Amino acid sequence: MPKRVNFSRHLEKHWLDQVAIWSSQGIGKAELNANIERMLEHHVQCKVNRGKTRNQLMGIWFDASTVDEAWHNNAIGFVQQSENVPFILHWGMLIAKNYFFADVVRFIGRKSKHYDCFTYGQAQKYIAELYGDTETVKRSLRSVLKTLVDFEIILREKSGSYKPQVMGYEIEKKYKNWLVISLMQNRGTSSRSVLDLLDDLVWFPFSFTLSVNEIDQSLFELHQQGNNLVLFRK
């Protein structure tokens, strides 16, 4: 997996909701770009930064060039079927398409197992080991943290530290196989044990369970390897 830093601007949930809805309506790239530009006009004053934010939003909910197209279309279908855009769809898209975002989330998930809070310095040290100690990496880390504050996945404390929020949000059955593929795409693999999939720290805010009966066998083959049940994408 390439260690690409691709989160230069923070995102807000209501922006993602709106872009997901527009994408589900089948509008073209030029029109979607124009819609996002108008939406961001009063939120992001700098034209250059507005363009970066727009490109990130397009990359998540419009551009399917880096992921499985059928998987991407399934997400669009879920949006079309929903009165409100389920937050878990944004999460799955971000995990599959943005490795940097996923690595920051894993750091927070690891910290949340042992500590109530973490500092920016701790996060920066960990991410610098993966991506390098550059201003681009630091800026992108700040953008991810600001995004997660907006998502209410972490809280910014008065001390300047961050407190992870374990929401315990139960994931609906219809999204589980789609999320499994999200994680496989993030990991760049077509097979993984069920235990590893469920234990991945990207799910730390949620309650993600997966029984054998919930596995879509039109998407996966199941193999028992020792004590592990392994899923292979078809």
PLM region spans:
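Positively charged, polyanion-binding regions of nucleic-acid-associated proteins
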Residues: 14-23, 90-116, 171-192
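Conserved binding-pocket/active-site segment within a compact domain
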Residues: 110-178
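Basic amphipathic alpha-helical segments that dock to polyanions
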Residues: 51, 55-57, 141-151, 211-223
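Eukaryotic partner-binding/assembly regions in large regulatory complexes
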Residues: 1-95, 106-107, 118
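Short acidic, hydrophobic short linear motifs in intrinsically disordered regions
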Residues: 31-36, 114-128, 188-201
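Short amphipathic alpha-helical segments
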Residues: 49, 100, 137-140
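Accessory, usually C-terminal, subdomains that scaffold auxiliary metal cofactors
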Residues: 157-233
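Short helix-coil junctions and helix-kink-helix linkers
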Residues: 37-47, 125-136, 195-209
